[in-house]
Swiss-Prot record:
Keywords: Cell membrane, Disulfide bond, Glycoprotein, Membrane, Phosphoprotein, Receptor, Secreted, Signal, Transmembrane, Transmembrane helix. Residues 439-549 are annotated as: Required for IRS1 activation and IL4-induced cell growth. One of its GO terms (molecular function) is interleukin-4 receptor activity. Receptor for both interleukin 4 and interleukin 13. Couples to the JAK1/2/3-STAT6 pathway. The IL4 response is involved in promoting Th2 differentiation. The IL4/IL13 responses are involved in regulating IgE production and, chemokine and mucus production at sites of allergic inflammation. In certain cell types, can signal through activation of insulin receptor substrates, IRS1/IRS2. This is Interleukin-4 receptor subunit alpha. SUPFAM superfamilies: Fibronectin type III. One of its GO terms (biological process) is production of molecular mediator involved in inflammatory response. Isoform 2 is expressed in kidney, spleen, lung and liver. Residues 1-25 form the signal peptide. The modification Phosphotyrosine is found at Y492, Y566, Y594, Y622. A motif (ITIM motif) lies at residues 698-703. The functional IL4 receptor is formed by initial binding of IL4 to IL4R. Subsequent recruitment to the complex of the common gamma chain, in immune cells, creates a type I receptor and, in non-immune cells, of IL13RA1 forms a type II receptor. IL4R can also interact with the IL13/IL13RA1 complex to form a similar type II receptor. Interacts with PIK3C3. Interacts with the SH2-containing phosphatases, PTPN6/SHIP1, PTPN11/SHIP2 and INPP5D/SHIP. Interacts with JAK1 through a Box 1-containing region; inhibited by SOCS5. Interacts with SOCS5; inhibits IL4 signaling. Interacts with JAK3. It comes from Rattus norvegicus.
């Protein structure tokens, strides 16, 4: 019994061991993956749970599910340790073909199932990939179609071209080709020039579901092409900038090297052991000086270097550049007629080594004198009266001779103005006249003409009379117009702004007495350079006499408030017109302004006196403007000279003959406007200076415009509607077409009886107040009512001889 139990237990143990062994064999993980190239091959893959030798342990059986089909066997291969692949050869497939598959191992069947080739198509990889570069500016890739032309998928494929850099595969470009032709063309400039690229291609079926084929064998090439201009421009600019920088650095270091070799060897005063001696400081005005800080900031190193080489040229030019901004601020605008220049001496420095002679070069430079307007000139004139007093004028005479002459001349006219207003100047001028020595044997005749009425001009004879006077000398007067000869000087530009009130009859009487006193005194009569007489010896110079007069009467008298000379003259003309309105042909019309003065000129230009019996020609009598010597050249006759800066008086040979009669001078006057228009006189009219620098033809022009030659006038609003006013194109002066000009006055001069000879000369007259006047009467004339007209000082003071 025991034996039977033991046998049963042994059988059960064997069964259990067999079951365990059978259950521990190969196991398939999931369904296999099968695809077909749709030509002649189908492929299946299996994933196993353990490492298996596919060719020895597994076997695949397949057959087409069709009648009378046979079984086919495929031996799998290991694609990996746990993957088995089996490629099955099939007939040319069609869309309806289906295959039955069974996977067997040594122990039994592992898997079974069906597969349809049209459900999963994987085309084969393309081949024969080539690159063509003969296309202009493009690359051409070509490959072969994996399907034959009779295949259904020959025209149903999609191609993908991958182009990547050989050195960096991550940088690539993909082109999809959907057309049937197996080629791709793309521009060469889409790729970077100078880089090696690699290309490959794969295909996909469009007619059946499937997957991408494997990549075709790749090809490589070197991409190179010429860059366009826009792409080459940044590179060219960069290279150019680098080249320019290198060139500049090369030049800079070369110049520095040359400077050390050549420039630094030039001797300079800064490194010289010689001693510098300053001979004379720069004499410039306050506005031309600058602080050392400004000079140091504005000076440049290269200018300093050039100044060392060319001191006389570049140093002046640098100085002008420094002074031009400040001069433009301080100096007002100046017309071309007012341009004045004065010399200024530049400082000189001499290097004085031992036993070495160094020559001194004197450099002169011209600076433009500042011109002030009328208001500033009036303020400076008032300040000049105080600064030129005897206690303040001591230091002024230590300056240059030109400054002394300008100050003395200005103080002289200030003294004349004070004498006109306060009566002190008459005695001073008498004293100064007495100081002038007169040479024996010479007779000096001076005529001072002033308007004493609205229709006549009175002439007074001062000085010594000829030894044999003619009784017919003063028989009558004839009015003669003399053209103006005007000279410009900045020192006398504002004297007409000062005018004195109209003198009363008592003052006129005192003035006539003073004139008589002046007739008795001896006058200085310089010798005419054309005469053959001996020259006159002067005890004292003209400047010393003038300086003594300034010191004696500089502070005497008080000047009244300045008024307009033109306004006083218009009032005087109106007053004369109201008094003489009843006399026809004598008094001016009732008009105002320039028309009244024009009527005064026309009335005074007519001869009112008749010559007595026995005269030679014309009105007869003494003619002061006629030269008895016919061959002597005429001299210029400047008017409005204030008794200054005239030519040498003629010799006794040039005096007037006794049978001539003095003629009244009809002066051509212009009215002073708001702006002073001055121009230098013509060269033939400027008197020749004599003595020192003071005789420079200082003549003031306040009435006549030198640009157009007409009398200055300014019409009021009521006159604009009555008289046709014409504006001169040169200066803008308004003048009447009927008003006289310089040319008209010259014609009037010829038409008056007793024509003035061209050899008439003007001599130096005594310094008398400009409003001193007298009434000249002839024996054959009836008294004509006259009235002294108040005229601004400096506008009507005329002396002739």
């Amino acid at each position: 019994m025991g034996w039977l139990c033991t046998k049963f237990l042994s059988s059960v143990s064997c069964l259990i061991l067999l079951w365990v062994t059978g259950s521990g064999g190969i196991k398939v993980l999931g369904d296999p993956t099968c695809f077909s190239d749709y030509i002649r091959t189908s492929t299946c893959e299996w994933q196993l749970d353990s490492t298996v030798d596919c060719s020895s342990q597994l076997l695949l059986d397949y057959r087409l599910l069709f009648e009378f089909s046979e079984n086919l066997t495929c031996t799998p291969k290991n694609s990996a340790d746990t993957v088995c692949v089996c490629q099955m050869a099939i007939e040319e497939p069609i869309q309806a073909d289906t295959y039955w598959l069974e996977l067997w191992s040594e122990r039994g069947q592992l898997w079974q199932g069906s597969f349809k080739p049209s459900d999963n198509v994987k085309p084969p990889a393309p081949d024969n990939l080539t690159l063509h570069t003969n296309v202009s500016n493009a690359l051409l890739l070509m490959w072969s179609n994996p399907y034959p032309s009779n295949n259904f998928l020959h025209k149903g494929l999609i191609c993908m071209v991958n182009i990547s850099r050989e050195d960096n595969p991550a940088e690539f470009k993909v082109y999809n080709v959907t057309y049937t032709e197996p080629k791709l063309s793309f521009p060469v400039n889409t790729l970077t020039s100078g880089v090696r690229y690699r290309a490959r291609v794969r295909v996909l079926s469009q007619s059946f579901p499937g997957i991408w084929s494997e990549w075709s064998p790749s090809i490589t090439w070197y991409n190179h092409f010429q860059l366009p201009l826009l792409q080459r421009l940044p590179l060219g600019v960069s290279i150019s900038c680098i080249c320019i920088l290198l060139f500049c650095l090369t030049c800079y270091f070369s110049i520095i090297k040359i400077k050390k070799i050549w420039w630094d060897q030039i001797p300079t005063p800064a490194r010289s052991p010689l001693a510098a001696i300053i001979i004379q400081d720069t004499k410039v005005s306050l506005w031309e000086k600058q602080t050392r800080s400004q000079e140091s900031t504005k000076s440049r190193h290269w200018k300093t270097c050039l100044t060392k080489l060319l001191p006389c040229l570049l140093e002046h030019r640098v100085k002008k550049e420094r002074e031009s901004p400040k001069a433009a601020k301080t100096k007002p605008l100046q017309s071309p007629e007012k341009a004045g220049w004065y010399p200024a001496e530049v400082s000189r420095t001499v290097l004085w080594p031992e036993n070495v002679h160094v020559s001194v070069v004197r450099c002169m430079e011209l600076f433009e004198a500042p011109v002030q307007n009328v208001e500033e000139e009036e303020d400076e004139m008032v300040k000049g009266d105080l600064s030129m007093s005897p206690e303040n004028s001591g230091g002024g005479f230590q300056e240059s001779q030109a400054d002394i002459m300008a100050r003395l001349t200005e103080n002289l006219f200030s003294d004349l103005l004070g004498a006109e207003n306060g009566g002190v100047g008459q005695s001073s001028m008498a004293e100064s006249s007495s100081l002038l020595p007169s040479e024996s044997g010479q007779a000096s005749t001076s005529w001072a003409c002033f308007p004493t009425g609205p229709s006549e001009t009175t002439c007074q004879v001062t000085g010594q009379q000829p030894p044999h006077p003619d009784p017919e000398r003063a028989t009558g007067t004839a009015c003669t117009q003399v053209p103006l000869v005007i000279s410009d000087n900045p020192a006398y530009r504002s004297f007409s702004d000062f005018s004195s009130p109209a003198p009363n009859p008592g003052e006129l009487a005192s003035e006539q007495k003073q004139a008589g006193h002046l007739e008795e005194g001896d006058l200085l009569s310089p010798v005419d350079p054309h005469s053959s007489g001996p020259p006159m010896q002067q005890a004292e110079s003209w400047e010393q006499i003038l300086h003594m007069s300034v010191l004696q009467h500089g502070t005497a008298g008080s000047t009244p408030a300045p008024t307009s000379g033109y306004q006083e003259f218009v009032q005087a003309v109106k007053q004369g017109a109201s008094q003489d309105a009843g006399v026809p042909g004598v008094g001016p019309s009732g008009d105002t302004g320039y028309k009244a003065f024009s009527s005064l000129l026309s009335s005074s230009g007519v001869c009112t006196d008749t010559a007595a019996a026995g005269t030679d020609s014309g009105c007869g009598g003494y003619k002061p403007f006629q030269n008895p010597v016919p061959n002597q050249s005429p001299n210029s006759m400047p008017l409005f000279t204030f008794g200054l800066d005239m030519e040498l008086p003629p010799s006794p040979l040039n005096s007037a003959p006794p049978n001539s009669t003095p003629e009244c001078l009809g002066l051509e006057l212009g009215l002073k406007g708001g702006t002073w228009l001055k121009a230098p006189p013509p060269s033939e009219q400027v008197p020749k200076p004599f003595g020192d620098d003071l005789g420079l033809g200082i003549v003031y022009s306040s009435l006549t415009c030198h640009l157009c030659g007409h009398l200055k006038q300014h019409h009021s609003q009521e006159e604009d509607g009555q008289i046709h006013v014409v504006a001169s194109p040169g200066c803008g002066c308004c003048y009447d077409e009927k008003s006289p000009s310089l040319g008209n006055l010259s014609g009037t001069l010829e038409s008056c009886p007793g024509e003035m000879s061209q050899e008439a000369n003007l001599t130096l007259a005594p310094r008398t107040p400009s409003n001193l006047s007298g009434v000249g009467k002839g024996p054959g004339h009836s008294p004509v009512p006259s009235q002294t007209t108040e005229v601004p000082v400096g506008t009507l003071g005329v002396t002739v001889s």
